[in-house]
Amino acid sequence: MTRTKVLFLCGGISGEHEISLISCKHILKAINREEFELGLIVIDKSRRMLWVQEADLQSIPDNPKNVKTPSGQEMLFQAYASKERGAGFYSRDSRVSFEPEVVFPILHGVGGEDGSIQGFLQTAGLPYVGASVKAASLAMDKAMTKAVCIEADIPVVPFHIVRAGDRLENPFGYPCFVKPSEEGSSLGVSRVKSDSELKSAFEEALRFGEKILIEPAIVGREIEIAVFDDGEEFIASPAGEIRCVKTDFYSYDAKYVDADAAELIIPAALKDQELKELQSLAKRIFRVLDCRGLARVDFFMDSDGKFLLNEINSMPGFTPISMYPKLMALAGVDYASLLGRLIRATKS
């Protein structure tokens, strides 16, 4: 059997660079080598594309604070076929070459999950796993996600947009959350308890983007759904719940550094009707934003039992603690099957 040539892109320029590397490391451990021939390019923080040996990626730790970007050969991209070679990625000395049939961009955050890399791949004519340029861009911007969902009568967490130079106002009272609109992994997010903390939280969020959201702190439960669509089956998984143990919210450190800071409850304890409502909402959001392949949809369940959209991730994490592959396994799609189905659907 001829194997499908799949190029994995990871790293990137965002604050989630290390998370992307860890996600890709674990994807490569799980993927079926008999069906797929793999290539690996790491995008470093200087935007260089590096051809990296898989063993070097596998050697990185799972704690992002201890991750160093692997070194490799710098690659160039040729978007057209010539007499000498086809469209693909090549080292400067042409000793390394890879002409992918499918690209799997395991990239999170700005520059990787916001339509940027998707636009590059689409312009190059390379099929890629995950959201389109439009869907990735919408899903990355929390304010735009919510604006579109409001038009579709989908309940969302209320929000107020503030930019540098605007009058800094909190219309919701305290506690509230201040966060960048276009960042993931809780980077730049602060839980604010008083007026005296608001300005510093705003300045922290500005380190990660120009558009800042202020949102009320929802009293209730944080619940997530994995959505999968390969054109043959459209799945909304059982629910998972995040319960913070040591922190006020699910921060970057709680997600990736301190394994005891939060408890992941899989499956979440919900009534049958509650789960059906949540799954229906997740599928609606996936369709409204025109997502493709995969997404994780994050909700709050407030004290009245109402579900509110928090955000959607169009390229969810695949780290050892990531909710998406765990929920898909609970839905009956194991890690290797999940990857294979996404790639085959993209190729076809």
Regions found by a protein language model. Give the residues of each.
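Conserved beta-strand edge residues that scaffold enzyme active sites
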Residues: 45, 135, 162-163, 219, ...
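Phosphate-binding site of ATP-dependent enzymes
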Residues: 193-280, 301-308
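ATP-binding N-terminal substructure of ATP-dependent carboxylate-amine bond-forming enzymes
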Residues: 1-134, 138-140, 144, 151, ...
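ATP-dependent carboxylate activation and anion-phosphoryl transfer catalytic cores
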Residues: 2-4, 10-13, 271-348
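A glycine- and small-aliphatic-rich helix-loop capping segment at beta-alpha/alpha-beta transitions
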Residues: 119-128, 196-199, 330-332
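Short hydrophobic/aromatic-enriched beta-strand-loop microsegments
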Residues: 127-131, 156, 235-236
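Active-site nucleotide/adenylate-binding loops and adjacent lid/helix of ATP-dependent enzymes
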Residues: 2-10, 14-15, 21-22, 93-97, ...
